[in-house]
Structure formats: C-alpha cells, structure tokens
Amino acid sequence: MDLRRITDFDAPELNVYARLTENQLLNRADPQNALFVAESSLVIGRALDAGCAPVSFLMETKHVTGKGAALLARCPGVPVYAAEEDVLTNLTGFHLTRGMLCAMRRPPLADPAAVLRGATRVAVLENVMNPTNLGAIFRSAAALGMDAVLLTSAGSDPLYRRAIRVSMGTVFQVPWAYVPEDWPALLRAQGFRTAAMALRDDSVRLDDPRLTQAEKLAVVMGTEGDGLADATIAACDFTVRIPMHHGVDSLNVAAASAVAFYQLGRRA
C-alpha cells in the first residue's frame, strides 16, 4: 500500500480534492486526463466495478485499515493520502460524511446507439441542470427498471461529485450517453416510441395501454422549471401527464421521474 500521511496542505497531489472545480476536473482541453471524484466506500466500489481507474484516495486514517481496506486491496500501488478527520475538514473545507474520497479517471463517453442496443425502456433527459436532481433521477432509473439514460449536452454532468453522491453510485450501473440534437430520429430508428412528460391539455394518462404495452419506450423528461421544449414535445409520439390533486400542478423533475419510471419502466 502506498500510504502517504498528509503534512502539506499545498501539495499539488491534493488539488483534485480541495482546489479544482468540476469544470477543471472535466479538463475539456485534455479529455484523456479528465477526472471525477467519488465519495463513500459504496460509491467508490461501484465505480471500480464499472471499470473506472483510480488515481488516488483521500481518507481518514481509521478507514485505511477499516472500511476502506477492501477497496485499497483492489487498488495496489494507488496513492492513499490519509489524515485525521479534523485535518481533512480543514483541507477540503467540508466534513467528509463518509470519510473517504477517490479521484478516478473519466471513462470514454459511450455511443448512444450502443447504449440503446438491447434496451426496451430508457429515459431521455433534456437539459436537466441540477446535479442533485440528476443524481436522484439515476437512482430511480436504476431502482425502477430503466435500461439506460440519454442526456442532452446542455444538462448537468452525471459525473459531477454531487450527482454521483445523490445517485448512490448508480451512474456507474445504468448505461448512459449524450445524444445529438436529432435524438428523436435516433430513437425512432431503434424502434422506440417516445413519451414526453408535459403539462398539456392533450396529454394521455400515465397508465394508457399504448404506453405500458409498447415494446420499446423512451420516457422524456425536461429541465427544471420550463420543462420540455415545444419542439421536443411535438417530436414525441405521446404527451403524458401525471395526475395531480389539491391544486398542485406538477412535481419536481426528480419526483416526477420516479413516478413515471415506476409506471412506464415495465411492460404490461
């Protein structure tokens, strides 16, 4: 084990945990060296299971031989930076609720056609900007039977630290890919019907048999606040509304996705 006690807060090896922004980690100028940071033994383990390559660990000293030991055994030779809890809090500026972080290399982006191969139920997220919502959507997608998640390029990044944390690492379990602007054509070519979740007078019921009996179905969710673009709704086969009560007109996109995935993530 390459254990390194933290003695210098300014060591450049610690920049990834304390000083680099998410955009700097993304490293668009040199994507082969782009990184992300995973938090907690569960999430780090899921990232390793998905084949993500670790660069270094940062953890409380007690976890080196405690709950982090099994992870470290899977990563021989990877530097492990360790210190007591109060030292790590001073370094990162926040309390490590799970006691460990792991910097990892970003995997190559998946091809959307490959992600769709063999899938029958997928989610399409149009410009979902909030990483907390994005992480929650991934967790629901994993739990409720969605085979893949497709994202437009203007939305949040599934490998932002908050998105990873909220998803409980399911961003490493559910296949996902960014889609081109003409993604409705891509889905049609793969045999998918598309269901736009939107507040429209002509919306069909969530339990409409045409949806539940579709061989392949894509559930399309829009950005926070504005929802789906009119052009997107027009390009979809169905517009679907979740029934509301007590004067509530809509749900947060993360909550709405859970309802939609539960109903539509399975065939009748």
Question: Where are the language model's segments positioned?
Answer:
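Boundary-proximal intrinsically disordered activation/regulatory segments immediately upstream
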Residues: 1-67, 155-156
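RNA substrate-binding interface of SAM-dependent RNA methyltransferases
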Residues: 4, 105-202
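Glycine- and other small-residue-rich loops at beta-strand/loop junctions that grip anionic moieties
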Residues: 6, 36, 126-127, 152-153, ...
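Amphipathic alpha-helical repeat scaffolds
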Residues: 40, 129-137, 251-256
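Short, aromatic/basic amphipathic alpha-helical patches
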Residues: 66-77, 232
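A glycine-rich helix N-cap at a beta->alpha junction
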Residues: 74-93
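Structured adenosyl-cofactor binding patch, chiefly the S-adenosyl-L-methionine
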Residues: 100-102, 140-144, 153-172, 230-268
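Active-site/ligand-binding-proximal alpha/beta "capping" segment
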Residues: 196-248
